[in-house]
């Protein structure tokens, strides 16, 4: 426990002075031919402004107020501040045929890139304008609980909003980012990132509509953000496609408010390396299918993580979303075998099934939850999940009226995806916790309605 407390203090100190500034000229995209009429594709003009700014050593590329700049793919570059003035909108072109660069390299099964960069430094995206991913334009039929996905084989044309690969010194501040068709803000191999004061407003019916994905990245701070997302709001991971960027560590999330149809704050499920030294503090989670989740499904490890001072509200949503209203969920199970469109990237090269790594030294402190289910901690074998601390964790169990009760969700795992626990037995237990092959220290207290 002392070790975890030291990790918390060190992480907070690490980020106190984080910040960058991009100085130089200000270039208005309209001076480079952008029309801003919301109908003409302005990508070429915006790219000309970015290229000119980069050639001159950096500065600000300005999207002026009261214009909508529809655009296809745009490449961001070093020493650029992309600044959106109030009432300016950067809107994704809805034409699927113009998105050709995969967000995951050779794996084309997980969407394309819209606003992107690779191996640059000193990038900032600021202002009180809006970046709009035009998400519904890329969806199929609207269903009761979600949007149907258009049929794909190996190629998924849905664009990710921001794919930022190998960025050293990154700021995203104050902007509104909305309507992602796939992942919204994807940090890959970034070092020194500060996401502060943004509104991230995704459609709650869009599957795979993650908010912020921190992938193989280090020294990241996410603070004072408001996030609504159909899929995970904030997710830490290590995807196999980007293994060259190394582990994910030294991450702070603080003062955020989140709503998700999946998991509000998640670690996993993709994790082929290590995720360590993570602090999530002072957050509020509302109306989510799962509150806090560690979902380890690959050979990587998750260690030294602190969740503290969190209020959360979980309720049962449709099974198209992973989760069964678990306020706290800590698991390590081998990934399911299957015929997913990117199945060749799910396991180590040349293998047809995978393993799952250790999850250890995870602390939950000062958590208050209202939920339609209890907490779940489990692993595929004894010793895989251990050192899980509960201190001052309180769960108010609310009996759901319409959905099936007393089921925990292990997806995507090999074998049965659901664990059935009798609801009457659950509420008769002195704690709101169900465990499987796991070692916990302390237990969540509970009341029931």
Name every feature range the model reports, one short phrase each:
Residues 1-6:
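Positively charged n-region of N-terminal signal peptides that target proteins for export
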Residues 20-449:
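Extracellular/periplasmic carbohydrate-active domains that bind, remodel
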Residues 7-8, 223:
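Small/flexible residues
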């Amino acid at each position: 426990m002392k070790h975890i407390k030291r990790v918390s203090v060190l992480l907070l100190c690490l980020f106190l002075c984080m910040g960058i500034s991009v100085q130089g000229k200000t270039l208005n995209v309209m001076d480079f031919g952008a029309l801003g009429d919301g109908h003409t594709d302005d990508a070429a003009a915006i790219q000309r402004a970015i290229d000119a700014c980069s050639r001159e050593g950096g500065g600000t590329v300005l999207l002026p107020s009261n214009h909508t700049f529809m655009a296809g793919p745009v490449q961001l570059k070093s020493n650029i501040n992309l600044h959106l003035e109030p009432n300016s909108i950067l809107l994704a072109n809805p034409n699927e045929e113009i998105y050709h660069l995969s967000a995951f390299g050779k794996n084309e099964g997980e969407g394309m890139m819209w606003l992107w960069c690779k191996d640059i430094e000193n990038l900032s995206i600021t202002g009180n304008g809006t970046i709009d991913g035009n998400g519904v334009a890329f969806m199929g039929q609207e269903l009761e609980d979600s949007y149907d996905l258009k049929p794909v084989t190996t190629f998924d044309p849905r664009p990710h909003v921001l794919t930022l690969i190998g960025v050293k010194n990154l700021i995203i501040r104050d902007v509104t980012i909305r309507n992602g068709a796939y992942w919204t803000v994807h940090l890959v191999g970034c070092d020194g990132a500060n996401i502060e004061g943004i509104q991230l407003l995704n459609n709650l019916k869009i599957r795979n509509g993650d908010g912020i994905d921190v992938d193989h990245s280090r020294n990241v701070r996410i603070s004072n953000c408001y996030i609504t997302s159909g899929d995970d709001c904030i997710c830490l991971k290590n995807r196999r496609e980007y293994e060259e960027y190394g582990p994910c560590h030294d991450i702070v999330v603080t003062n955020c408010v989140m709503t998700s149809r999946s998991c509000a704050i998640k670690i996993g499920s993709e994790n082929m390396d290590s995720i360590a030294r993570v602090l999530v503090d002072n957050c509020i989670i509302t109306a989510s299918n799962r509150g806090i989740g560690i979902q380890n499904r690959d050979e990587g490890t998750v260690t030294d993580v602190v969740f503290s001072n969190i209020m959360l509200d979980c309720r049962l949503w449709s099974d198209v979303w992973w989760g069964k209203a678990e306020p706290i969920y800590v698991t390590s199970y081998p990934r399911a075998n299957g015929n997913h469109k990117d199945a060749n990237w799910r396991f180590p090269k040349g293998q047809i099934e995978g393993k799952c790594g250790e999850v250890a030294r995870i602390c939950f402190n000062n958590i208050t939850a209202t939920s339609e289910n209890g907490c779940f901690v489990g692993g595929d074998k004894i010793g895989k999940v251990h050192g899980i601390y509960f201190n001052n964790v309180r769960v108010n169990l609310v009996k759901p009226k319409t959905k099936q009760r007393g089921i925990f969700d292990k997806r995507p795992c090999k074998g049965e995806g659901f664990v059935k626990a009798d609801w009457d037995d659950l509420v008769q237990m002195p704690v709101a916790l169900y465990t499987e092959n796991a070692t916990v220290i302390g237990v969540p207290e509970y009341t029931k309605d």
